[in-house]
C-alpha cells in the first residue's frame, strides 16, 4: 500500500513537471529564413518535355515578411542531384545549361513573403541528348547574405521525362 501511494505521488509529480517544464521555451530561434515553397511538400517534380519543350516554375519564400529587399539566387547543384539519385536509386544526369533558360536571381521585396515565381523553360532536347535521363537540381542561396536559407527546404529537383 505504501509503495502504491509513493508510486502515485511520483507519477503525479512527473506529470505536473512535464506540463510546466517548457513555459519559457524560445520558439523563435530560426528567425527569418528563406526556402523553396515547392520543397515544403515535395523534394522533386516530374516535368514532361515534348517537341515544344516544357515550362516549370519554382518560388523563393521567406518565413516572415521581408523588412527590406532580399536578394536570392537559384543555382544548379550537382551534389543535390547526387543525393537525389542515391535516395531514388536513379541515375539522372544534370541537364546541360544550353537546354534550359531561367532567371536565377530573384528579389523578395520589403513587406512581402515571396518573390514572383521563377519561370524555367526547357528547350526541346537535341538528338544527342535523347536516350539519357536528365534532371535540373536547384538550390536556393542567399545572393546578398541578408537572410539565411534553410538546409531542409532549400533544394528542389525537376526530373525530366522526354516523350
Name the predicted role of every residue range.
Residues 161-163:
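Conserved small/polar residues in nucleotide/adenosyl-binding loops
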Residues 18-21:
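C-terminal motif of bacterial Sec signal peptides marking the signal peptidase cleavage site
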Residues 1-9:
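Bacterial N-terminal signal peptides that target proteins for export
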Residues 84-106:
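Short beta-strand and strand-turn-strand segments in soluble, beta-rich domains
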Residues 27-62:
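Beta-sheet-dominated interaction scaffolds and their linkers
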Residues 107-114:
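Short proline/glycine- and polar residue-rich coil/turn motifs
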Residues 144-156:
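Beta-sandwich strand segments
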Residues 126-135:
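Short glycine/proline/serine/threonine-rich loop/turn segments at secondary-structure transition edges
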